[in-house]
Amino acid sequence: MQQWSEAITVEFRRGEFVESSHRVHAVVATADQMISVWGDGERMTMPRSAIKSIQVLPMIALGAAAAFDVSDDEVALAASSHNAEGAHTTAVAAWLQRIGLGVEALECGPSDPISDLACKALYAAGEPPTSLHNCCSGKHTGFLTLARHLADDPTLALPGYLDPEHGVQTRVRDAQALMTNVDLSNQTPVIDGCGIPVYQFPLASLAQAMARLVMPSAVPAEFQSAA
C-alpha cells in the first residue's frame, strides 16, 4: 500500500490570493485491500448520499423490487439524488401510485429542486415544492416499497419508516454494516437532512464497500443478487 502522510490540499484562488483552503482525505481500495491513502484512511465520516447505492440493496435483495416491477430507472432514483426535473418527479409519483401510496406517504419533507431551472419554473408557476421535489424522494419511495412488500411484519408499519428501529431502517443499517464490515450495533445514529438515521464509517471501509459493490463476487451472499 502506498501511504501518503499528508492529506491533499485544495486551494480556491482569486487571482494570486488564496480565498479558501480545504484538506481532503482520500483512499483508493479494492474489495479486500487498500491501494493508496492520502491523509487519515481511518477518519470517521458520514457518507450521506454517497451511500444510497448500498441503502437500496435490501429493496432488491428481499424481493420488493421484483414484486412491484421496479424498473432500472426507478432503482437509479432510489440509489441517487435527483434534480427534481419533470422526468424525476413524474417517475417518483408513478412509482408511489403503483405501490398504492401518494406523495403524503413520503416523510422526507418538501424542498426546493436542486436544478435551478426546475426551481425557477416551479415558482414561476406559483406552485410550492412538495416532497416529490426533495432530492431524496426516490430513496424514500424505495423504503416505502420495501415496507409494502413486507407488510406482514409488524415492525414495518406505516407511517414511521424513519425511526431507527423501524423494520426498513434496521434492514438498511444491516446492509451498510455488512457491506462495510463495520459493527453499527452500538453506534447511535444521527439524522440526515431528509430525516433518515445515518451512521459514521472509517473512510477506508467506505472505499472497500464501494469496490465490493461493483464486484458482485465480493459482495456478502445476502446481497449478491442485488449488486
Region spans (language model):
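Beta-lactamase-like hydrolase cores
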Residues: 1-42
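Active-site-adjacent helix/loop patches that line small-molecule binding or acyl-intermediate pockets
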Residues: 1-3, 71-186, 212
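A generic local secondary-structure boundary/capping motif
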Residues: 15-16, 131-135, 195-198
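Active-site-adjacent structural elements in folded domains
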Residues: 41, 190-194
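Short, conserved micro-motifs enriched in small and acidic residues
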Residues: 44-53, 196-200
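Active-site SXXK
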Residues: 47-65
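Phosphate-handling active-site elements
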Residues: 64-72
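Active-site-proximal alpha-helical segments within enzyme catalytic domains
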Residues: 197-216, 222, 226-227
